[in-house]
């Protein structure tokens, strides 16, 4: 499941950590990198 809602991020990959209840997987890698910096 690409869209994770709630605290189920524990079972997801580090790249799929929940952000505000919405998985950051929905964002492009560029946006993802932007969040890290």
UniProtKB/Swiss-Prot annotation:
Region listing for Disordered, in residue ranges: 1-20
GH18 domain ranges (all copies): 1-37
InterPro entries xref list: Glyco_hydro18_cat
Keyword Glycoprotein in annotation: yes
GO cellular component, one term: extracellular region
Alphabetical keyword list: Developmental protein, Glycoprotein, Secreted
Major localization class: secreted
Gene Ontology biological process: carbohydrate metabolic process
Compartment(s): Secreted
PTM section of the record: Glycosylated.
Function recorded in the entry: Cooperates with insulin-like peptides to stimulate the proliferation, polarization and motility of imaginal disk cells. May act by stabilizing the binding of insulin-like peptides to its receptor through a simultaneous interaction with both molecules to form a multiprotein signaling complex.
Family, per entry: Belongs to the glycosyl hydrolase 18 family. IDGF subfamily.
Official protein name in the record: Chitinase-like protein
Organism: Heliothis virescens
């Amino acid at each position: 499941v690409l869209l994770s809602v709630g605290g189920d991020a524990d079972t997801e990959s580090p790249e799929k950590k929940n952000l505000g209840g919405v998985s950051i997987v929905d964002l492009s890698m560029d946006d993802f990198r932007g969040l890290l910096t």
